[in-house]
């Protein structure tokens, strides 16, 4: 598991959905949980959304919603869907900045 990977999240309380791993690579092996941004097909056009599509390697169009982040146990993250490049990760970081104001 690495930063930038989009994996299937299998949380018992949520429908199965893609989740982008944002935890830094140096920490992943030492942690039980990782920080993720969850994807949804419910596109609202918010400045905190990053659109992804089949051209990005996703199975269908969706958005990564920086207003919907979570710390998930690594065991909840399953198969790899795609690894995002640095430009896409930068878009997600800008969306997180807008979402949190940090």
What does each model-identified segment do?
Residues 15-54:
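Compact nucleic-acid interaction/catalytic patches
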Residues 5, 17, 62:
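Short beta-strand or tight-loop elements
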Residues 56-102:
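C-terminal terminal-subdomain/extension
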Residues 1-9:
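Short coil-to-beta transition motif at edge beta-strands of beta-rich domains
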Residues 3-4, 51, 77:
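Residue-level detector of alpha-helix boundaries and kinks
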């Amino acid at each position: 598991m690495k930063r930038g990977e989009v994996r299937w999240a299998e949380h018992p309380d949520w429908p199965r959905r893609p989740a982008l791993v944002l935890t830094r690579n140096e920490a992943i092996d030492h942690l039980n949980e990782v920080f993720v941004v969850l994807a949804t097909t419910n596109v609202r056009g918010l400045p905190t959304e990053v659109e992804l599509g089949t051209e990005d390697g996703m199975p269908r169009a969706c958005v990564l919603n920086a207003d919907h982040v979570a710390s998930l146990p690594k065991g909840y993250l399953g198969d790899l869907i795609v690894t995002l490049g640095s430009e896409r990760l930068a878009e997600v970081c800008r969306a997180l900045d807008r979402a949190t104001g940090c």
